[in-house]
């Protein structure tokens, strides 16, 4: 019944995913109702389901369609009362934010920074963190100072401007959720406290690997780097995510909703300087 729009799909459309062969229907996530099943005992017709990753939209046709044909092993049943637009905002984006939150081992006293705060994952992370850890002090970075008010409304306590990959602050942080990736990694580490954790989750900076990185001299003593890969998914973790959203009354509604006929406009918005939060397409 719907799906999220992701920057990785824009990268693929632009030709940066070398393993993808065209023509190909894009789309790495979806939510909906099973209309036909070859495993009716586990996923009978009428079941509410989620699917993400697993080479959907890459090795085989993805979710930018009215119907999606998926391998049974990547179809996950979920129990949720969310409406379709909100449910469509959850799978890839909130799953990534949820995994990042767990890997950072957040404590109430932490000063937490999100690099790439206005992205879908950045906004989702803010909502999850403030739902479960309301006392943690949350900072968000953005290249566009004009998004400050919207970031504060989304749950950030303070906003820091990012100038070409360098944060305009002398502050250091206990935990950093880095959604920019390798292009900003050195600067992120420079703002990580001793004993702090940085979780690299995204590649919004458009760079896939870190050049000339010496783990001894560049990381710094007592600092920790981890990562989260949203392709590592199972039904239990997805249900735990939906349960958390319900338990803490988290508003997971998307920022923008488009129709199936307007996918081009949806990608254009996500790729624009005005983009904020999660963008979804609903097919009802």
PLM feature spans:
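Glycine-rich beta-strand-centered segment in the early N-terminal region that forms part
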Residues: 1-4, 14-56
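NAD(P)H cofactor-binding loop motif with strongest signal on the N-terminal glycine-rich segment
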Residues: 37, 117, 180
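NAD(P)H dinucleotide-binding glycine-rich loop of Rossmann-like/cofactor-binding domains
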Residues: 51-116
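Mid-domain Rossmann-like dinucleotide-binding core that forms the NAD(H)/NADP(H) cofactor-binding site
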Residues: 87-164
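C-terminal hydrophobic helical "lid"/dimerization subdomain
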Residues: 99, 233-284
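Glycine-rich phosphate-binding loop and adjacent beta-alpha segment
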Residues: 151, 183-250, 283-284
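A short acidic, Gly/Pro-enriched loop at the edge of an enzyme's catalytic core
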Residues: 168-176
